[in-house]
Curated annotation (Swiss-Prot):
It comes from Bacillus velezensis (strain DSM 23117 / BGSC 10A6 / LMG 26770 / FZB42) (Bacillus amyloliquefaciens subsp. plantarum). GO terms for biological process: glycolytic process. It catalyses: (2R)-2-phosphoglycerate = phosphoenolpyruvate + H2O. This is Enolase. The gene is eno. Its cofactor is Mg(2+).
Amino acid sequence: MPYIVDVYAREVLDSRGNPTVEVEVYTETGAFGRALVPSGASTGEYEAVELRDGDKDRYLGKGVLTAVNNVNEIISPELLGFDVTEQNAIDQLLIELDGTENKGKLGANAILGVSMACARAAADFLQIPLYQYLGGFNSKTLPVPMMNIVNGGEHADNNVDIQEFMIMPVGAPNFREALRMGAQIFHSLKSVLSAKGMNTAVGDEGGFAPNLGSNEEALQTIVEAIEKAGFKPGEEVKLAMDAASSEFYNKEDGKYHLSGEGVVKTSAEMVDWYEEMVSKYPIISIEDGLDENDWEGHKLLTERLGKKVQLVGDDLFVTNTKKLAEGIKNGVGNSILIKVNQIGTLTETFDAIEMAKRAGYTAVISHRSGETEDSTIADIAVATNAGQIKTGAPSRTDRVAKYNQLLRIEDQLAETAQYHGINSFYNLNK
């Protein structure tokens, strides 16, 4: 039997040069799993706690030796002798060992590393791909990539307030063609920006981070790049935005301060602006359009746009079934962003996806801005037949690692692989 004989964690670096946790799980059969934990820049108020050491003389306070020690000294002894294929039991033990609502005792970064490494070791023992281990033999849907090609907000040092402007190749016949389309548009955008004398350096997630005249100019420029690459905006390629508006929401006056444009908007005015942008550009998805605590604003946005635009809750739902249940009950949003480190275990992640689907919400599997070479989320996207993945531009190895893993999976699935394109938005009037 694949009993666990050792669980070992170490401190490694993520794509931003900040420390993160890597965990290795060893079994008596020789089956082995390794996982690296991602980290976010714009984080939701209700996310599970990422444990940092706080020692300013070491990695500017961002060290994770406390989380590493929690794995090696507290979690590891408790898992010895466990059957590594008992994912639910392992995750439940991790939750109980921590004993807090937000995983603040052991750290979500410690717990998640163990949860993912155990899943990899189990797949290794069974000699099947990770996506198949996690999702079974019906796991065959390749996701539509949501590719962040213009970065702003917390992800870039520029004057753009909206954090992410993305493209979605919904008209592609399969995943590899979708990736090709995205890559060609990315290169086309580079030449468009260059011709305008704009900066073509990339941000945390591989997208470009130019200074633009307005947030709308980002949409205009992307449409120009899509056409220059030879594709039809709206028909073959849709646009998506992640406003991450909690980052520019002012709690004191309850308004949205778009400092890049020098304007201040109320919730209703933000909704008006989104409605105007949707009428002018082929936008199919808006994430965190309003502050995570502005439930009235989110409800208004859902009433106005929820039938024709995917309204994704990231900071709003933080991959948490309690927050999602509240959203479903109040008619807020129609989609959830899934980030494994927001909740801390694979079991809880899959519970959130299941709840979303039962309620008719879509689920978008997502990276974080601080990523690694770990490609687990690619397997999760296929395992859950989620239909969408958000993992940055086709640039930077930490982003491309996920796309390359999806190419491998599509190859393995061969003629059984499915790519639903526009039909991934099954709850919209398309």
